[in-house]
Amino acid sequence: MSNNTNKQYTTQELNSMSNDDLARLGTELDDVTIAYRKERFPVANDPAEKRAARSVGIWAALGILGGIGFLITYIFWPWEYQGHGDDGLMWYTLYTPMLGITSGLCIISLGIAGVLYVKKFIPEEIAVQRRHDGPSEEVDRRTLVALLNDSWQTSTLGRRKVLQGLLAGGAVMAGLTIVAPLGGMIKNPWRPQDGPMDVMGDGTLWTSGWTLQEQGVKLYLGRDTGAIAESHTGESGQHWITTGVSRLVRMRPEDLAAASMETVFPLPAEDVNDGDLYDPQRDVYTNHMHSIHGPRNAVMLIRLRTADAERVIEREGQESFHYGDYYAYSKICTHIGCPTSLYEAQTNRILCPCHQSQFDALHYGKPVFGPAARALPQLPITVDEEGYLIADGNFIEPLGPAFWERKS
């Protein structure tokens, strides 16, 4: 070991040293000695050196190609969403995998090139560092402990138990906040529910109770009567009887006055229990409540004045969705899903009270004010042979606010 590690060198002495001398001095100042060093290719123009350089160059070139491929994919690949059955679905499906493949090729190839360069070109050496036995000097230990104690005492945190608990809880919650997003990988949000589709849809954003119409189920426009189960108190305590209670009933056109609105829900034919089909022994209350609680089931049935109906502007492809003066629009606002529960008969505007979006009922539910950007979806309706209003099809677009997979 050099005896000059503690020497104070002047500028002139340092200037007189070569680069090798300065490098050796630097290691000695850290108590490190280079005991052995061997060049990988001591002979000039060694064929093995050329092969090593070629292998490193190949991996580096692959990394560059991967980076270029990533940029080309990111900029020019058809990334716009395509639904099932649409042209270009395969290209859209490959967009994210191609980003991963090209970026992975770039990073891994450059990493391999770096490792190979170190293994094949950096000289092989053995370095020895002096081991410092025993603890640090007493003065270093005492002063370090004193500084830590002083920091703790001057912070006054030791006597603030409430703040200690809050800070500790905040640290725990911060950790959970970092880990919690991983929960999105546990459940597939597009996996349909177990079992067949019911009056609440299949659990995905594409469906609602009205989707049952596509499966051949006859759906009436059900009016909510507000009927509730009857309460009875017996020896076993209070219980509720739902037999014979019909929460939803069918509607005829004459049940709705001009310039008025009614909220309706999908009522499957098998769950009808009103009028000439009423049976006091049937229990359909639970099914009716499921329809009412369906997250995208609520529909506004609007009857326009005859004069107003003559001024309606139909949406292209939806000219036959109405029945006379009757128009049915989804009650789920296209902004963030609030209920558009207000209808202004004088102006024929549908209002969302949450964020003040307004939709023109005479212009296919087009937004005319507020943050909503899309028209309210329209439900095709007609009447059956008995004169009851029924759904004449399903909505032709997803209901509610926008989400990543929808096109508009």
Swiss-Prot record:
Role noted for this protein: Iron-sulfur subunit of the cytochrome bc1 complex, an essential component of the respiratory electron transport chain required for ATP synthesis. The bc1 complex catalyzes the oxidation of menaquinol and the reduction of cytochrome c in the respiratory chain. The bc1 complex operates through a Q-cycle mechanism that couples electron transfer to generation of the proton gradient that drives ATP synthesis.
Higher taxonomy: Bacteria, Bacillati, Actinomycetota, Actinomycetes, Mycobacteriales
UniProt protein name: Cytochrome bc1 complex Rieske iron-sulfur subunit
Disulfide bonds, paired cysteine numbers: 338-354
Membrane topology according to the record: Multi-pass membrane protein
Residues where [2Fe-2S] cluster binds: 333, 335, 352, 355
Subunit structure: The cytochrome bc1 complex is composed of a cytochrome b (QcrB), the Rieske iron-sulfur protein (QcrA) and a diheme cytochrome c (QcrC) subunit. The bc1 complex forms a supercomplex with cytochrome c oxidase (cytochrome aa3).
Residues covered by the Rieske domain: 293-390
Cofactor binding remark: Binds 1 [2Fe-2S] cluster per subunit.
Species of origin: Corynebacterium efficiens (strain DSM 44549 / YS-314 / AJ 12310 / JCM 11189 / NBRC 100395)
Gene for this chain: qcrA
InterPro entries assigned to the protein according to its UniProt record, in alphabetical order: QcrA_N, Rieske_2Fe-2S, Rieske_2Fe-2S_sf, Rieske_Fe-S_prot
Gene3D superfamilies: Rieske [2Fe-2S] iron-sulphur domain
